[in-house]
Each structure stands twice: as structure tokens, then as C-alpha cells.
Swiss-Prot record:
Gene Ontology annotations for the cellular component aspect, listed alphabetically: cytoplasm; endopeptidase Clp complex
Enzyme class name: hydrolase
Similarity field: Belongs to the peptidase S14 family.
NCBIfam families linked to this entry: clpP, PRK00277.1, PRK12553.1
Record PROSITE patterns: CLP_PROTEASE_HIS (PS00382)
This protein's encoding gene: clpP3
GO biological process: protein quality control for misfolded or incompletely synthesized proteins
Protein name: ATP-dependent Clp protease proteolytic subunit 3
UniProt catalytic activity: Hydrolysis of proteins to small peptides in the presence of ATP and magnesium. alpha-casein is the usual test substrate. In the absence of ATP, only oligopeptides shorter than five residues are hydrolyzed (such as succinyl-Leu-Tyr-|-NHMec, and Leu-Tyr-Leu-|-Tyr-Trp, in which cleavage of the -Tyr-|-Leu- and -Tyr-|-Trp bonds also occurs)
Enzyme nomenclature, EC number: 3.4.21.92
Upper lineage: Bacteria, Bacillati, Cyanobacteriota, Cyanophyceae, Synechococcales
Database matches in PANTHER family: ATP-DEPENDENT CLP PROTEASE PROTEOLYTIC SUBUNIT
Subcellular location: Cytoplasm
Length: 194
């Protein structure tokens, strides 16, 4: 059940679900697995906020175990294309595609709360069917791995070889380690300073 916020005005009381109220403050959330439905909602919110005010920052809070690479890339591409800066804030866990999206925020505005965790790894895939179908899926997963590694290298300043080695298995980082790695820019304990 979503919490409801009641606002009073000269025209009476209005009830909003909490996420709609926060959207008015340019705050959006990725708090689940990344899938096509979540990507559609986040892309729509970013496009709405860009149309509303192309100069004012968007805050994207991330607490996600990851999910679909293609859905995540749709969110990422939109983050890169919209005019407003996208501030990313990790609360809880940003893992896999969640960590990738966290690192894709505007340079200098990628943040994490002190007790959050960040985890990077290579894309996961499973293939079944005839040998030819498995080969097609294997080529696609290798393409996605190279794409993600290249973009992570670009956002972190690490070389591709290091990214490839570090994402070979689950690689967990504290917020401070994520700063040193280049995944984020700052650990914040007071969100009012954003």
C-alpha cells in the first residue's frame, strides 16, 4: 500500500500518493528490479521533468538489485539525453544494472548514503534451445558485456582491462570504495545538501 500525502489549499484538500508528490519535487525512484515496465515509467518521468523544466536537476534514487540489461540501457540512454542533470543517489543496494545506472548520473552528482552498498558484475544470461540459438545468445551477451564495460570505463576512468577483471565475479564496494573506483563522486549523510 502506498502512503498518501494530504495537501491543503484554498480549494480544499488534495491527496497524492507519495511518489506523485515527490515527482513534483523532481525526485524519482528505482526501487525494484529493472524491467521493461520500470524502464518505461522512469523514461516517462524523466521526459516529463525535462519538458517541465529543462534546466532543473532530476534526482534519481537507486535501490535496485539490477535486472534486464536492455531495459537498463533504455533508462541509461534517456539519462544521457535529457537536458537536466541527473543526480543519482544510492540508498540500500545498487547492484548490477542498478550500479551501472548509479554511475551513469551526471559527473560530480553521483552520490551514495554512508551505509549503502554497490556491486558490479558482468551481465548474466541463460540460453537454451538448439546449438545455433545458444550461439546467437552467447554472441549477444558478449556484445552487451563489452558495451557495459566500455561505458563503465568511460564513467569511472578505469581502463577496460580493470573493469573486465573486476566484473568477472560479483565485486562489492562500500560507498567510499565506490568513490575511489570512480563509480560515484561523493558519500553524503545529509540529503538536504543536494
Amino acid at each position: 500500500m502506498l502512503p498518501t500525502v494530504i495537501e491543503q489549499s484554498g480549494q480544499g484538500d488534495r491527496a497524492f500518493d507519495i511518489y506523485s508528490r515527490l515527482l513534483r519535487e523532481r525526485i524519482i525512484f528505482l526501487g525494484t528490479d529493472v524491467n521493461d515496465q520500470v524502464a518505461d515509467a522512469l523514461v516517462a518521468q524523466m521526459l516529463f521533468l525535462e519538458a517541465d523544466d529543462p534546466e532543473k536537476d532530476i534526482q534519481l534514487y537507486v535501490n535496485s538489485p539490477g535486472g534486464s540489461v536492455t531495459a537498463g540501457l533504455a533508462i541509461y540512454d534517456t539519462m544521457q539525453q535529457v537536458s537536466p542533470d541527473v543526480i543519482t543517489i544510492c540508498y540500500g543496494l545498487a547492484a548490477s544494472m542498478g550500479a551501472f545506472l548509479l554511475s551513469g548520473g551526471t559527473k560530480g552528482k553521483r552520490l551514495a548514503l554512508p551505509n549503502s552498498r554497490i556491486m558490479i558484475h558482468q551481465p548474466l544470461g541463460g540460453a537454451q534451445g538448439q546449438a545455433v540459438e545458444i550461439e546467437i545468445q552467447a554472441k549477444e551477451i558478449l556484445y552487451l558485456k563489452e558495451t557495459l564495460n566500455s561505458l563503465l570505463a568511460e564513467h569511472t576512468g578505469q581502463n577496460i582491462q580493470k573493469i573486465s577483471e573486476d566484473t568477472d565475479r560479483d565485486h562489492f564496494l562500500s560507498p567510499q570504495e565506490a568513490v575511489e573506483y570512480g563509480l560515484i563522486d561523493k558519500v553524503v549523510s545529509n540529503l538536504n545538501s543536494i
